[in-house]
C-alpha cells in the first residue's frame, strides 16, 4: 500500500480530472497502460488517452494508468502495483523515454530482461511512434512489440489474451501472427515461439499497420485536466499521415497515406465535448492541410469555443485560421522555419517557405493582436555551413524590425523566443542517407550561434544539449546492442553524459581488440 503522501498526491490528480473510466479492480482482465514519463507529459498525449479509452470500452477489460511520478510505481485508479496486471503496455513517444521503460521495470520489482521473466510476470508490450522508428533498443526488455495503430491492433490482441490466458507460450505464438506485431528475440527464445530473424544485430521491422479510415471512433481527449501541457483542453485529431515529404521527417515517408476526419464528424466531436471544456486543440502533422480547416474554424467561431493548433505550417496557414486563433485569445504564434537560410530549407523539403511567406504570416499575426512569436530551428543539418548558421540571427534581426513596426498599434513590442534543437537523422528518411556533420563541427556551429544570438535584442533562447542529441542518435539508429547503452544510462542514474563517455570507451576498446 502506498504511503499517505502518495495517496494524497494521486487523489488530487484524480479529483482534478473530468471524464474517464472507473472500474473495480479484479472484475476483468487487466492492462496497465504505462506512459514512461510524468503524469503532466503523459496526459498531454492524445494517443495515450485514445488507448486508455479503447481498452476500457471492452466490457471484460480494465485499463489503468501508470506514470513515472511515483516510486514504487502504482496504478493511478486503484493504487495497485504493476505486478498485479495481466499486461503492461508501454506507449513510447520519445526515444530518451526508452530509459524510463527499463527504470520502470526495475522500480516495479519486475526482472527487466525478457529472457529472465517467467509466465508469473505480466506480459510486457511496447508500442508508440518510437517503435515505428526503431524498436531495437527496447527489444531486450519487452516481450511483444506492436507496430500498429491502436484501433487496428487492440481488438485482436485483447481477444487472443482472453483466449490463451494462463498459457504464455500460446498467447505469444498467436500474437506473433498479427500484422505489425512481433515477439522480441529473447522472449521468442524463452518460449520457443516464432520471432524475427536476427542478422548483424538487427531484425526486420514490420511496416506499421494503419486504420484505413478515420472517424469511426472518437479521436479526442476523454479525460480533461488542468495538470497537462494543454490545461483543460480537449485535443481533437484532424488527420494522420502527412501530405508533405520533408526530408528529415519520419511521418511523411512512412506513415502515409494521409487520412483526414470528415468535417461533420469533427463538428459532432466538438459539440459533444463542450460540456467538458471551451478549449479545443487541433492535432495533426499539418493542421492547415485539412481540406476543410477554414470551415472547421468558422464552426468553432459560431460556437465561440477557443481553438489552438498543434502545428502550423507557415506555407499553408490561412487568414481564417489566424483570425480564429486570435479570437480564441492567443497571444503568440509558433512556426517552424527549421533553418535560417532558404538553401537549407529547400534541402529540408520546405521550398515553399521563402522569407516573404514567413513575414506575411508574422505581419498578419501582429495585425490580429498576437504580438509574441516562437520559432523552431535545427542546427547540425547535413551540408550546413557557418553562413547557414549565421542566417538564423540575421533572420531574427529582420523580424525585430517587423516587430517594432507591427507592434506600434498595441503599445508594446512582443517577445521573440526560439526552440533550438540538434538535428538527429531519422531512419527511413532521405536525410539519413547524407553524410552527417562531425560532432566537433556541430559543437562549433552551436558556439557561433550562441554568440550571435546574444547580440540580438529581445530574443529568448536556450542552447540545446549536444549530449542529449548524441544519446538520441544512438537510440534512433542503434541495433539490438543499443540496449547496452540504456543499461549504462540506468547504471549512471540517468546521466546521459556519463553513459556516453563509457559507451565511447567501450567502442574504442572494441576497435582496439
Residue locations for each model-derived region?
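Radical SAM enzyme core and accessory elements
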Residues: 1-20, 27, 31-33, 446, ...
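N-terminal [4Fe-4S]-dependent radical SAM core
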Residues: 3-32, 39-40, 186-235
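Conserved SAM/AdoMet-binding glycine-rich loop
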Residues: 33-34, 38, 96, 267-374, ...
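Canonical Radical SAM [4Fe-4S] cluster-binding loop centered on the CxxxCxxC motif
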Residues: 45, 227-263
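Short secondary-structure boundary/capping segments
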Residues: 48-50, 140-142, 161-162, 253, ...
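Short helix-loop-beta junction
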Residues: 50-62, 301-302
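Glycine-rich beta-alpha loop elements in corrinoid/cobalamin-binding modules
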Residues: 68-197, 427-479, 487-498
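Flexible glycine/acidic-rich beta-alpha junction loops that bind and position SAM and/or redox cofactors
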Residues: 188-190, 244, 291-293, 320-321, ...
Amino acid at each position: 500500500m502506498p504511503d499517505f503522501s502518495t495517496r494524497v498526491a494521486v487523489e488530487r490528480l484524480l479529483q482534478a480530472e473530468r471524464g474517464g473510466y472507473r472500474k473495480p479492480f479484479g472484475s476483468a482482465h487487466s492492462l496497465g497502460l504505462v506512459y514512461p514519463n510524468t503524469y503532466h507529459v503523459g496526459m498531454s498525449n492524445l494517443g495515450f488517452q485514445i488507448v486508455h479509452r479503447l481498452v476500457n470500452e471492452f466490457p471484460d477489460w480494465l485499463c489503468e494508468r501508470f506514470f513515472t511520478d511515483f516510486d514504487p510505481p502504482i496504478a493511478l485508479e486503484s493504487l495497485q502495483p504493476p505486478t498485479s496486471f495481466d499486461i503492461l503496455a508501454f506507449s513510447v513517444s520519445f526515444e530518451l523515454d526508452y530509459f524510463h521503460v527499463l527504470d520502470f521495470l526495475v522500480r516495479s520489482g519486475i526482472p527487466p530482461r525478457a529472457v529472465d521473466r517467467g509466465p508469473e510476470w505480466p506480459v510486457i508490450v511496447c508500442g508508440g511512434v518510437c517503435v515505428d522508428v526503431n524498436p531495437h533498443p527496447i527489444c531486450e526488455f519487452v516481450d511483444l512489440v506492436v507496430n500498429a495503430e491502436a484501433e487496428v491492433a487492440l481488438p485482436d490482441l485483447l481477444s487472443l489474451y482472453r483466449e490463451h490466458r494462463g498459457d504464455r507460450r500460446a498467447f505469444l505464438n498467436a500474437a506473433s501472427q498479427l500484422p505489425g506485431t512481433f515477439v522480441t528475440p529473447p522472449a521468442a527464445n524463452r518460449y520457443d515461439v516464432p520471432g524475427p530473424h536476427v542478422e548483424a544485430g538487427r531484425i526486420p521491422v514490420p511496416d506499421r499497420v494503419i486504420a484505413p479510415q478515420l472517424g469511426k471512433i472518437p479521436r479526442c481527449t476523454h479525460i480533461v485536466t488542468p495538470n497537462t501541457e494543454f490545461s483543460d483542453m480537449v485535443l481533437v485529431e484532424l488527420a494522420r499521415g502527412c501530405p508533405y515529404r520533408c526530408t528529415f521527417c519520419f511521418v511523411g515517408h512512412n506513415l502515409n497515406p494521409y487520412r483526414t476526419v470528415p468535417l461533420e464528424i469533427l463538428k459532432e466531436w466538438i459539440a459533444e465535448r463542450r460540456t467538458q471544456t471551451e478549449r479545443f486543440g487541433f492535432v495533426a502533422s499539418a493542421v492547415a492541410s485539412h481540406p476543410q480547416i477554414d470551415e472547421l474554424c468558422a464552426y468553432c467561431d459560431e460556437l465561440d469555443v477557443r481553438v489552438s493548433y498543434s502545428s502550423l505550417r507557415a506555407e499553408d496557414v490561412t487568414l481564417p485560421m489566424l483570425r480564429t486563433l486570435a479570437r480564441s485569445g492567443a497571444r503568440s504564434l509558433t512556426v517552424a522555419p527549421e533553418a535560417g537560410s532558404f538553401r537549407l530549407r529547400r534541402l529540408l523539403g520546405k521550398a515553399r517557405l521563402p522569407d516573404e511567406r514567413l513575414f506575411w504570416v508574422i505581419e498578419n499575426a501582429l495585425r490580429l493582436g498576437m504580438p509574441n512569436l516562437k520559432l523552431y530551428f535545427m542546427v547540425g543539418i547535413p551540408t550546413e555551413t557557418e553562413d547557414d548558421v549565421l542566417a538564423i540571427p540575421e533572420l531574427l534581426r529582420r523580424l525585430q524590425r517587423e516587430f517594432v513596426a507591427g507592434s506600434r498599434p498595441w503599445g508594446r513590442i512582443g517577445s521573440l523566443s526560439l526552440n533550438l534543437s540538434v538535428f538527429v537523422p531519422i531512419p527511413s528518411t532521405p536525410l539519413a542517407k547524407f553524410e552527417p556533420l562531425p560532432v566537433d563541427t556541430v559543437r562549433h556551429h552551436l558556439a557561433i550561434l550562441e554568440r550571435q544570438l546574444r547580440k540580438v535584442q529581445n530574443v529568448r533562447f536556450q542552447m540545446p544539449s549536444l549530449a542529449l542529441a548524441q544519446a538520441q542518435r544512438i537510440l534512433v539508429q542503434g541495433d539490438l546492442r543499443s540496449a547496452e547503452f540504456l543499461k549504462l544510462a540506468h547504471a549512471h542514474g540517468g546521466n546521459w553524459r556519463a553513459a556516453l563517455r563509457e559507451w565511447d570507451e567501450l567502442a574504442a576498446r572494441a576497435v582496439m581488440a
